[in-house]
Amino acid sequence: MKQCWLCGSNGSYDPLDKHHIFGGANRKKSERMGLYVYLCHNRCHIFGKYSAHQNKDTMLKLHQYGQRKSMEENEWTTEDFIREFGKNYI
């Protein structure tokens, strides 16, 4: 069952969006590697005070989560991650 990564909601009140942790040039790579989370559209993804697109701390936590997940699943070092995504978030 899908739930919001930030607040835990199941999306019954505010529909869930798929948020690619590493966007822009890395969006397709995020999709392929499963580096995405579900977020409530209004409150946690786009418009809320702590939403991924409005709050630097939330975005940093997402990037750190994505880096740890990809490093664990691919048995990468920090240097391997930087080669793939261009930056260290941890």
Model region roles, listed by residue range:
Residues 22-36:
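Short linker/helix segments within small regulatory modules
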Residues 63-90:
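Short flanking/linker segments adjacent to small metal-binding domains or redox-active Cys/His motifs
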Residues 9, 45, 75:
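Residue-level marker of positions within ordered structural domains that often coincide
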Residues 36-62:
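Short Cys/His-centered divalent metal-binding micro-motifs
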Residues 16-24, 41-47:
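Histidine-centered catalytic micro-motifs
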Residues 1-17, 42:
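Short cysteine-rich loop/turn motifs with clustered Cys
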Residues 14-17, 35-36, 66:
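Amphipathic alpha-helical interface surfaces
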Residues 1, 57, 88-90:
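Short, Lys/Arg-enriched, disordered terminal segments
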